[in-house]
Structure formats: C-alpha cells, structure tokens
C-alpha cells in the first residue's frame, strides 16, 4: 500500500472514531421529549376512534412537556423492544403504565405516581374463582410485561407449574379475543387495562378477587439520565400542587390516582 493511500485511510478512520466519540458524549440538544409507549395499552396509551394517540399517560406527558417548554413526540414501541429503543436513543423515556417493581436498578425513575396491581381475567361463566382453579388451564400474559415477570418469579413457581401452559401475547386486544374464543382460560394483566377492556362487557368477563401482585407505576429513563428525570419529576410535582394531576386522573379514572407526595406550600 502506498503512503498516500495509507494516510488517507488513517485520516478517515480517525475521523470516524472522533465522530463516534462525539456522538457518545453528545447531550440531547434538541427540544423534543420523545415518549415511548405501547399503543395498545388503554387507558394509559392507545389509538382513539379518530386515529389519534390518547390516554391518561399520554395526556400527562403532553402537559409535562408543554410546561417544560418542549415539543413532544409520541413514539409507539414494541413493548418487548423497549430497552433497545431507550438505549439506542430512539426514545427519551418510557411513560405508559410502566411498572417499577423488580426493575428498580434497570432504569432511572421518577417517584411512583400511581398504584397498580396485576390480576387474572377469566370468562364469567368459566367457573374459575381462585388461583387454585387455574390448575390445568391455559394462561396468557403480554411478552415482557410485569404480569409475566411476576408469574416467572420464584414466589409464583408453584402456581405457574399448575397451569397447563403459560403463553405470551403481543397485545391485550388479541388476548381478549383468545379468551372469548376459548383459546386461553385466563389473562394475567394490569387491573387498569383490564377494567378498560371490560367496559360494557362486565357480564362476559370477571377479575379474580385475589391479585397476583401489588405494584407501582413510574416514568422510566435510561439508567443515569438524572437530568431529564429531575426535570420531569419537578414538573409532575407542580402538576400535583396546582391540581392538574388530579383533574386528569378524575377524567380517566373517576378519582385521583396520584401517589406523589409534595410538601404543602406555606
């Protein structure tokens, strides 16, 4: 290889390395908050009859971004790929009924803003009343969901092993169709989503009284991204203080779901 050709290649190589280093150190310099969410997770995030993204968390995120002086980009994601979306920088946060419990060390979190529980939904005429009645039954849960993670945990080994099979689904709309058709006997899922899906069909489906696990929702950021987390946390606290959080909660749930504690202003 002649010297000139070698030098040219070396310069290009060094330029690429410098560019990559620059990219890795580059802070987010645009003014957009890109929110990753599952668009099939009502009432937290979903597509309405007009084809628009809506939901409790969507409305909260929009209000938060507006107060922070940022444009918001709502980015639907495959829930099973959420970590890749976050680590690649495709999204800034996951804000969509995102369970903190068991994931505390994987993300940088806001304070928990809402309590939640994972439950089983069955057909009303199935005869299934308790967890014990699920023995020999087909149970489904969304891939990489908190419900699936709970059932795969040591605490629920005996229960899981009693199932005929623990299946996974990509979205809960599909799960309810499978339940209605008899392809599965129970769905493990978030109680808020279950209640939304069951609206107008309470005679067809029931939620078992005993929950799988109690948990909390938070907004999750890439581990170490405390700067953006702190901005969002402070804005959420403002929304609690001025009553906006309560107003949005009551619109979607009929009551105030907020669990963020703020000091009373003197």
PLM features: what roles do these ranges have?
Residues 58, 73-84, 165-181, 215:
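Short helix-initiation/N-cap motifs at beta->coil->alpha
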Residues 97-106, 152-153, 178-214:
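A ligand-binding cleft/hinge motif common to bilobed small-molecule-binding domains
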Residues 39, 115-122, 191, 195, ...:
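Periplasmic-binding protein-like
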Residues 58-67, 128, 132-133, 137-138, ...:
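Extended ligand-binding regions for polar small-molecule ligands
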Residues 47, 61-69, 147-168, 198-202:
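Ligand-binding cleft/hinge of the Venus flytrap
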Residues 32-55:
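Short glycine-rich His-centered loop
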Residues 62, 66, 71-133:
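Acidic, polar ligand-binding/catalytic clefts
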Residues 1-32, 258-266:
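Short, low-complexity disordered leader/linker segments with a strong preference
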């Amino acid at each position: 290889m002649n010297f000139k050709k070698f030098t040219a290649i070396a310069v290009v190589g060094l330029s690429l390395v410098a560019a990559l280093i620059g990219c890795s150190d580059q802070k987010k310099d645009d003014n957009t908050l890109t929110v990753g969410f599952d668009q099939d997770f009502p009432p937290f995030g979903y597509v309405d009859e007009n084809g628009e993204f809506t939901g409790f968390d969507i409305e909260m995120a929009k209000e938060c971004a507006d107060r922070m002086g940022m444009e918001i980009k709502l980015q639907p994601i495959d829930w099973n790929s959420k970590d890749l979306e976050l680590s690649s920088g495709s999204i800034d946060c996951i804000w969509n009924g995102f369970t903190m419990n068991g994931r505390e060390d994987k993300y940088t979190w806001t304070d928990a803003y809402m309590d939640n529980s994972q439950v089983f939904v069955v057909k009303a005429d199935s005869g299934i009343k308790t967890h014990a009645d699920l023995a020999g039954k087909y149970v489904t849960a969304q891939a990489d969901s908190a419900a699936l993670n709970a059932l795969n945990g040591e605490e629920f080994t005996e229960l899981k092993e009693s199932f005929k099979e623990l299946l996974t689904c990509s979205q809960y709309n599909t799960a309810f169709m499978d339940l209605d058709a008899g392809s599965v006997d129970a769905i493990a899922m978030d109680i808020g989503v279950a209640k939304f899906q069951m609206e107008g069909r309470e005679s067809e489906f029931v939620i078992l009284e005993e929950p799988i696990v109690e948990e909390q929702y938070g907004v999750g950021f890439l581990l170490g991204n405390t700067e953006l987390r702190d901005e969002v946390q402070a804005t959420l606290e403002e929304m609690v203080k001025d009553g906006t959080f309560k107003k949005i909660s009551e619109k979607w749930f009929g009551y105030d779901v907020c669990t963020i504690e703020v000091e009373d202003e003197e």
